[in-house]
Curated annotation (Swiss-Prot):
Residues 79-150 form the POTRA domain. Disulfide bonds: none annotated. This is Cell division protein DivIB. It is a single-pass type II membrane protein. The keyword Oxidoreductase does not apply. Residues 78-284 are extracellular. GO terms for cellular component: cell division site; plasma membrane. GO terms for biological process: FtsZ-dependent cytokinesis. Keywords: Cell cycle, Cell division, Cell membrane, Membrane, Transmembrane, Transmembrane helix. InterPro entries: DivIB, FtsQ_DivIB, POTRA, POTRA_FtsQ_type. It comes from Lacticaseibacillus rhamnosus (strain ATCC 53103 / LMG 18243 / GG).
């Protein structure tokens, strides 16, 4: 009977607590293997957190630094016009070109950068001598004005002053009492005739061009096309505007054969004659 009771007791179901204890005894090794996995993953999690923190800081600080940089730039002298220099001019003073830009040291370089073409056009409009103009920005606030000029071909005497004549035929409004002696003085030409005479003058050899002191629309001997050229070497040329471009090349050979100053007549033919009394007095 005792053996039967023991058999019955062994077949009784386990209580919940006994079941839990039995499971715990079966899984300790499995649990010990899982703990190291948690320890290995922990540094990776910390690294990811640090990266995320750095990324958030960059996203916050970068715009702030950019704003501070922009405000600092506009508050500094580097944001405004500094040194302005001119390249390419020979007859127009540099300061006159700079004044034509109407730039001041209070103007922002950013505004200059966006309006370079307009400023260049302002220079060309203010100074007829300037053929081309362009602005280049160097560094933070240095401006270089690169220019080219229309060639000066002579002067015309008007209103008690000598006014420059450009190769385009335009007569400048500004006059001077001391013209550059390397350029001839034109007189007697109409506004229509002056550009035509300039075109003829450009066809002369350079050495002869430099030796001309005056060009007069003399219109003598009933010839409306007659001109007179007074030369720096003391000779005078009488010619016709319709033929002078072809005949002017004979001038050096003619004067090389005579020792006396006089008139080189290229109007009809090509020859030398001495000054008449009236021509000599007017030439003196």
């Amino acid at each position: 009977m005792a053996w039967l009771r023991k058999k019955e007791q062994q077949s009784d179901p386990l209580t919940p607590w006994q079941q839990y204890q039995a499971r715990q005894q079966q899984t300790p090794r499995h649990d010990r293997r899982q703990k190291p996995k948690l320890d290995v993953n922990l540094p990776k999690i910390q690294t990811l957190r640090r990266r995320k923190l750095v990324k958030n800081l960059v996203l916050i600080l970068l715009p702030l630094l950019l704003l501070l940089g922009v405000f600092g730039y506009f508050a500094s002298p580097l944001s405004k016009v500094g040194l302005v220099s001119v390249q390419g001019v020979t007859t127009v003073p540099d300061q006159q070109v700079i004044n034509a830009t109407k730039l001041s040291d209070d103007d922002l370089m950013l505004s200059v950068a966006f309006h370079k073409n307009a400023i260049a056009q302002r220079v060309q409009k203010s100074l007829p001598e300037i053929k081309t103009a362009s602005l280049t920005i160097k560094g933070f606030n240095r401006i270089i004005i690169k220019t080219s000029e229309y060639q000066t071909v002579g002067y015309v005497y008007q209103k008690h002053a000598y006014h420059k004549i450009l190769v385009t035929g335009e007569v400048l409004a500004a006059g001077t009492q001391t013209p550059v002696t390397t350029y001839p003085v034109f007189s007697g030409f109409t506004a229509k005739e002056l550009p035509q005479m300039i075109t003829l003058l450009k066809q002369f050899p350079a050495a002869i061009r430099r030796d001309i002191s005056e060009i007069d629309a003399s219109r003598g001997d009933a010839n409306p096309n007659q001109i007179a050229l007074n030369m720096n070497d003391g000779y005078r040329i009488i010619a016709d505007t319709r033929t002078i471009a072809k005949k002017i090349k004979y001038y050096p050979a003619i004067v090389s054969q005579v020792k006396q100053k006089g008139v080189v007549d290229l109007e009809v033919g090509a020859f030398w004659r001495p000054y008449s009394s009236s021509e000599k007095s007017s030439n003196d």
